[in-house]
Amino acid sequence: TDGSLQQSCDHWVHDLMGRGASGRLISIDPKDGQARELARGLEYAFGACPMNGDVLVSESWRHRLIAIGNGRPRPVLTRLPVYPSRLVPATGGGFWLTAFTARTQLVEFVLRENAFRRRMMKEIAPEHWIAPRLRSGKSYLEPMQGAHLRTMGVLKPWAPPRSYGLVVRLSAAGQPAYSLHSRVDGINHGVVAAAEFGDALYLLAKGPGRLLRI
């Protein structure tokens, strides 16, 4: 997958807040290295995995999984409460889907308010934008929703997340079976990849820079 033609992977938040839709799915022939574009105009194509003759793709900015075959993309799982990232096959069938952060009402509101969003991007440093993050809680300058305030030294795990950690086990049909969380009061956020090895599941939490074993 190619998440964005307009922004580098380090500037993913610029692509989100700029309402980017230049992602692609590309097939590369292992014999001669020739590349073939299977789909374009995707809103940040992050992960891809074969599924029943199609390719299952996570489209992060549209919060969904789609199946891409010879025809038009077909929705498989929509209206996710998170920003999906990579997909990998799971032992026994199905898939592991990682999510690098969760959606919030505040960010959804900013994405709809075009004039405010453009002014924010122009006048405020990117690290202080009202936008999702791979990690949070490191600066008092971070934007917050009211319920995200620390009270008596405690941050509620169900508070609106600025960063989050999640991996979901999907069935062979791409439907959720169960999930594992690092909630708002956790630190293993920004989960961008998963891999099974032996009897363990390994996760890459990019927020704290950790490789996790479950």
Where in this protein do the model-derived segments appear?
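Sequence-structural signature of mature extracellular/luminal beta-sheet repeat domains
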Residues: 1-214
